């Protein structure tokens, strides 16, 4: 799982 900020 990846999160972008």
From Swiss-Prot:
* Cellular localisation: Secreted, Cell wall
**GO cellular component entries:** extracellular region
Q: What is its main location?
A: secreted
Keywords attached to this entry? Cell wall, Secreted
Q: What name is this protein filed under?
A: 34 kDa cell wall protein
Source organism per UniProt = Arabidopsis thaliana
């Amino acid at each position: 799982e990846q999160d972008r900020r």
